[in-house]
């Protein structure tokens, strides 16, 4: 199976005017498909042309000049301690017997001349090198084997166009050999590894994107989901990581977040580290829903790992929140506070769905007697966005029930199934001739836009939606039966490059011609937890996340807002 290091496509508005003399446009991404950085090198690097979906290096008139590109294989190039071991290229915390192996390198090139490929250590020592003669004509794939045992500390992979050559490059890949562990386990493994690449043990936080510097823009909600996914990955019947590692992650993150300044108890959505202190990132908010996601995650992880003291401290954090200060005139809780920690945001959690449910449950932990106002448009997610109907079920089993909930009268399981049916039908109805309809892709949800420079929310209620966020496939996977249907879809996605070994792409257009390879922390969290629930259901394993929810008296008491008769033994049964 091939994992792109980088496919050199560029997204730009076709009406954009290119200034005379421009040789390189900014790629719509500034990162590799591995979630790392890249750059240019050589005395003729400024002659490299990148104006379309290929790199062009014309050196036929420069017999003494060379130029090319380097790509970090693990972390940022400036982080020498992060390297790739070709015998186990996923993060080293993942068990060796579950890791893939890198056994080949492939480059797609055209033109005439000589091309050199090198793999180097962090110290710049050449660990592997090959010369490729490009003999003219159209693009061709050049595949070269590598010995994984000789590449245990690889830091960069570099291609260089040699003097006197005219060569074009459209992509660079690593050939992977994967253990035979089953499609359901593979989906969780790849999704968890993607999330783990976003995590920094140095800070205790998950980066919003894997390729950015640790501490520059970290996400609190995804950090909580990472801790929970790690607790799930450490369960004996899964065994991706050790229980000791999961406990260390839990303890480190709890300590790191415990040092944050809050706003009336609310945690920041995003944080950054400056002068050794981590605090809210300017221009972002103290967020009710992101606090809820983090705190639900940490409470469940503490119970799963037998760290009751942590679980109790998480409950205490919730009880210290000043919920009356967050309440809007209509009775709903606000989305939070501005970064000054004082100014209340005017919009509140009143739309029906998983986000509002988690916020309400958080308040009920603090005040068991509170009765929030009814949600707006019960049973109907805003815009028909997929993730809204599934978020709550990443944490709690109760919403697998078709009993009308006591708060809004919603039959959650039916609503979730109806959403899945609408998502699956949308492409064939709106885009019947598309690749998405042909391959059975779906996922009108939320995430980065197609350019990777802004947030996008789609949904089945909107016409002509042409951007798919496939995290919804894994979030809703446990709803589909038989499980083999999901398996076949995952196989098709793997074949089309939408679910490579590094995890699902962030988004893809309905025609299948454009996708965003960004490794983002939030959707990686959604994917990992969704894949875990799918794995346990497909194999009939105990779902440790759901069992922890059932064992928590605080969560059981809070859940009576929706299901007064639900006990710890029958939730979601």
Task: Describe each PLM feature range.
Residues 1-3, 7-179:
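Beta-rich carbohydrate-recognition modules and glycan-binding surfaces
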Residues 1-22, 30, 54, 173-573:
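Ser/Thr/Asn(+Pro)-rich, low-complexity disordered segments
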């Amino acid at each position: 199976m091939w994992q792109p290091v980088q496919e050199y496509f560029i997204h730009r508005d076709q009406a954009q005017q290119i200034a005379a003399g421009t040789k390189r446009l900014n790629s719509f991404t500034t990162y590799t498909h591995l979630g790392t950085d890249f750059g240019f090198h050589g005395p003729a690097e400024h002659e490299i042309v990148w104006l379309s979906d290929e790199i062009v290096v014309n050196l036929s008139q420069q017999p003494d000049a060379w130029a090319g590109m380097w790509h970090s294989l693990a972390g940022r190039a400036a982080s020498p301690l992060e390297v790739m071991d070709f015998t186990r290229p996923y993060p080293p915390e993942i068990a060796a017997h579950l890791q893939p192996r890198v056994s080949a390198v492939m480059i797609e090139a055209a033109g005439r001349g000589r091309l050199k490929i090198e793999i180097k250590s962090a110290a710049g020592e050449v660990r592997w090198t090959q010369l490729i003669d490009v003999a003219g004509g159209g693009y061709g794939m050049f595949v070269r084997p590598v010995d994984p045992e000789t590449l245990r500390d690889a830091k960069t992979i570099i291609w260089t166009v040699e003097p006197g050559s005219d060569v074009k490059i459209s992509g660079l890949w690593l050939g992977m050999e994967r253990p035979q562990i089953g499609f359901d386990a593979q989906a969780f493994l790849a999704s968890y590894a993607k999330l783990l690449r976003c995590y920094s043990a140095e800070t205790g936080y998950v980066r919003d994107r894997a390729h950015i510097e640790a501490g520059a823009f970290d996400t609190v909600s995804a950090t909580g989901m990472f801790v929970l996914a790690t607790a799930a990955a450490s369960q004996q019947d899964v065994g991706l990581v050790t229980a000791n590692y999961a406990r260390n992650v839990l303890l480190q993150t709890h300590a790191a977040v415990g040092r944050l300044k809050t706003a009336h108890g609310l945690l920041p959505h995003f944080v950054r580290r400056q002068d050794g202190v981590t605090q809210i990132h300017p221009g972002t908010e103290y967020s009710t829903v992101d606090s809820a996601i983090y705190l639900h995650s940490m409470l469940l992880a503490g119970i799963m790992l037998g760290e009751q003291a942590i679980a109790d401290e998480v409950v205490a954090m919730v009880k210290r929140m000043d919920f009356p200060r967050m309440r809007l005139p209509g009775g709903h809780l606000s989305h939070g506070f501005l970064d000054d920690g004082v100014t209340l945001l005017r919009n509140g959690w009143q739309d029906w769905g998983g986000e509002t449910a988690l916020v309400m449950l958080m308040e009920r932990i603090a005040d068991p007697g509170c009765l929030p106002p009814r949600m707006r448009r019960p049973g109907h997610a805003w815009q028909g966005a997929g993730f809204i109907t599934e978020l709550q079920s990443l944490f709690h089993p109760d919403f697998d029930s078709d009993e009308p909930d006591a708060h809004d009268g919603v039959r959650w399981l039916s609503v979730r199934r109806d959403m899945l049916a609408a998502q699956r039908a949308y492409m064939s109805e709106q885009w019947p001739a598309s690749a998405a309809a042909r391959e059975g892709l779906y996922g009108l949800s939320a995430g980065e836009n197609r350019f990777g420079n802004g947030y996008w929310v789609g949904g089945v209620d909107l016409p002509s939606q042409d951007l798919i966020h496939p995290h919804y496939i894994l979030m809703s996977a446990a709803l589909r039966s038989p499980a083999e249907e999901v398996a076949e879809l995952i196989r098709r996605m793997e074949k089309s490059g939408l679910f490579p070994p590094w995890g699902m792409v962030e988004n893809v257009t309905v025609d299948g011609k454009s996708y965003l390879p960004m490794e983002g922390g939030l959707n990686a969290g959604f994917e990992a937890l969704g894949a875990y629930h799918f794995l346990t259901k497909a194999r009939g394993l105990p779902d440790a996340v759901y069992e922890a929810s059932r064992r928590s008296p605080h969560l059981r008491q809070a859940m009576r807002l929706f299901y007064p008769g639900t006990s710890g033994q029958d939730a979601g049964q």
